[in-house]
C-alpha cells in the first residue's frame, strides 16, 4: 500500500520490504560492502505503519545508527490491560513493545511510535530529496461509510526526515503469476479455490 500525499515523488522514500530486502541481501552477499544497502546511518528516519514490517524497519534503522527514528501509527495506543470486550481466549489487544521499539527505547529513551497520527505532506529540498514530513493527529469518527480518521485541528507538526519508509500493509496478492497460469480470482483478488 502506498501513500498519496504531496511530495510523494521525493527521493529517499522506500517501501519497507524493499528497504529490508536490499539491506539483508547486501549483508548476506557482501557484508554491506557492495553499496546496494539503503543506509539509515546518521539519518532522521520516519516509518509510516505500525505492524511487524514497521517494527523490522525500526530495529534495522537503530542498528544502522540512525540519528532518530519515528514510527507513525494511525491507530490509537492500546490499553495496558485487556478491555472488557477483549476476553481470553482472544488475542490480547494491549500495549506492548516488540523488539524494534524496545531497541529504540533503550537508545533514545522513549517508544518511537506516534499514535493517532498521519502524514499529510512530504517536504523536499531543491534536489528533490525528502527533508521532512508534515503530520497531524487524527480522531476516529463514525461517517456514513464507517469509521474514518479525521484530522484534529491545531495538531499539525513537521518532523525532520532524511529517509522515509512506507510500511502501511499489503493490498492483496501479486497478480502476474496468477494471470500467467490463468487462475480465477475472487472480487478481493485472492485465488478462487475449487469447492468439493
Task: Give names to the regions the model predicted.
Residues 11-42, 141-196:
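FAD-site-proximal beta/loop scaffold in flavoenzymes
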Residues 50, 73-77, 124:
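Cofactor-binding loop segments of dinucleotide-utilizing enzymes, especially the Rossmann-like FAD-
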Residues 54:
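N-terminal Rossmann-fold NAD(P) dinucleotide-binding loop
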Amino acid at each position: 500500500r502506498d501513500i498519496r500525499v504531496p511530495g510523494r515523488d521525493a527521493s529517499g522514500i522506500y517501501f519497507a520490504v524493499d528497504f529490508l530486502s536490499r539491506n539483508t541481501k547486501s549483508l548476506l552477499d557482501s557484508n554491506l560492502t557492495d553499496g546496494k544497502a539503503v543506509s539509515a546511518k546518521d539519518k532522521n528516519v520516519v516509518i509510516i505503519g505500525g505492524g511487524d514490517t514497521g517494527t523490522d524497519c525500526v530495529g534495522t534503522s537503530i542498528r544502522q545508527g540512525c540519528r532518530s527514528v519515528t514510527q507513525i501509527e494511525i491507530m490509537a495506543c492500546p490499553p495496558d490491560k485487556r478491555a472488557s470486550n477483549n476476553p481470553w481466549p482472544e488475542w490480547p489487544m494491549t500495549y506492548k513493545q516488540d523488539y524494534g521499539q524496545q531497541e529504540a527505547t533503550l537508545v533514545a529513551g522513549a517508544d518511537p511510535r506516534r499514535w493517532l497520527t498521519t502524514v499529510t505532506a512530504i517536504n523536499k529540498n531543491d534536489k528533490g530529496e525528502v527533508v521532512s514530513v508534515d503530520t497531524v493527529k487524527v480522531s476516529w469518527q463514525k461517517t456514513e461509510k464507517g469509521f474514518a480518521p479525521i484530522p484534529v485541528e491545531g495538531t499539525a507538526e513537521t518532523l525532520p526526515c532524511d529517509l522515509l519508509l512506507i510500511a502501511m500493509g499489503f493490498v492483496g496478492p501479486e497478480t502476474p503469476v496468477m494471470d500467467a497460469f490463468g487462475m480465477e480470482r475472487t472480487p478481493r483478488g485472492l485465488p478462487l479455490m475449487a469447492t468439493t
